Amino acid sequence: MSGEQKSYLENQLEAVAEKTDAGYTFTFQREKIKLLDGLEANVIKDINPFFHKEIDVTDDEVIITIQPPSSYKAFRFMKAKDKKSKWQFAYQLVQAVQQHNLSRLNLIVAPENIVFDKGLTPYFLHYGVKESIPPYERDEERVWQELKAAAALAVDGAFAFEDYLKFNETLTFSAEAKAILDAESYDDLLELIQTHIDELEAKAKTYIHIPRKKWNIQRYIGLGLIVLLVPALIYSMYALFFAQPKHQAIVDSNRAFLNKQYSEVISTLSKYDAESLPESVQYQLATSYVEVENLGSAKTKNIENNLVTLQSDPQHFLYWIDYGRGEYKEAISIGRKLEYNDYIYFALAKYKQQLLSEDTNDEDIQKELDSVNSELEKAQKERQENKQSNSETSLVDTSEEQTQTDEEKQAEEKAAEEKAAAEEKAKKEEQKEKEDEKKETEKKDEKKDDK
């Protein structure tokens, strides 16, 4: 023990205090204590007779061994108790010290010297014997300060025992601990503790107390219900904000289609992905795009009679929806899936017009335009070869091909004109800048000559 820091109890007793299998032992050096005869220590056995106590006196040492009942706990276990139990223990500790009236036995109220039973009643392990075993004398002030520090430790527990005992004026304690340490009498301290107990009891009455097992069962049932309700809540939110508006849009578009209000059908369904719509609605939307597209009556009739019917592959519906929405790349992809050259050619022609309307000076757009031109030539060649066999279902006739070619030429010419105009404008601006620079230089030269 010499290499270890001694506890407050050991310093006060000038002894070694240990917890062993045999119980709590206090070892005193005979040369340091006033004990003359071992019989003088037997008075310790008279208090708390249900503690098993042994006193061994040798030439050099006095060893006192104390074994409380196995159900008793050391002071340090008070930290695990609930708040009300801590205050009740503190109350009984104050009473135990206040009611101690044995003149030959002297108290030392240190945490290492205290145990408590299941009723939270505190008991002291060691007592000093007057003029024989430390502490020798009754020191009211020491006991009072030790009591307040022990009560603060039991209730608060944020600091060590000696911090509460010695540093009340320098350390910042909790309001509860500070109130205990500032108490001026036993009655004041008991009243303070009783007030806190009453407050906790009043607060406890506002709660419903149930067994822990029942609480755990209810908690897990509640968690299970939450887990089950989350998907239902998500579905309800989806139905409220997405499914219901979508269903209403389908109903409205169907009414508009029956009334041949094709533009209304298109606008009503514009924000919904085509593949998410039922096939019958896809058919109505595709037909609406065919009707509003400037295809000519013959071609429109040909498409509706042969390609876009309720018995058609839904890919035909998706083609015309993508085509009508200006998503020509997707339309080209569907045409390739269907291996229908007219679809490919028609979407490529529109895609080319779309590219020509953009900035053809952009390198990426120009590459894409070259690729489209190449595909158009290939598709046109294949159509020429298969014209006779596909004449009945041909989407684009010869006159329309010429019209599309003319439109493409016009778009190309327009793009070329815009490009030439932009270049001419750039040249003029560059020339103007040069002239301005020349004039500025001449002015500077004139100023130099004047000087």
Curated annotation (Swiss-Prot):
Coiled-coil intervals: 362-447
Deletion consequences: Cells lacking this gene are blocked in YukE secretion. They display an increased bacteriophage SPP1 resistance phenotype. Loss of delivery of LXG toxins to target cells.
Chain segments carrying region Disordered: 376-451
Keyword field contains Iron: no
This protein's record includes keyword Signal: no
Ranges annotated as biased composition (Basic and acidic residues): 376-386, 406-451
GO cellular component, one term: plasma membrane
Subcellular location: Cell membrane
Membrane-related topology note: Single-pass membrane protein
Membrane-spanning ranges: 221-241
Lineage: superkingdom: Bacteria
NCBIfam families reported in the protein's UniProt record: T7_EssB (TIGR03926)
Sequence similarity: Belongs to the EssB family.
Protein's job: Required for YukE secretion. Probable component or regulator of the ESX/ESAT-6-like secretion system (BsEss). Required to deliver LXG toxins to target cells.
Name of the protein in its database record: ESX secretion system protein YukC
Species of origin: Bacillus subtilis (strain 168)
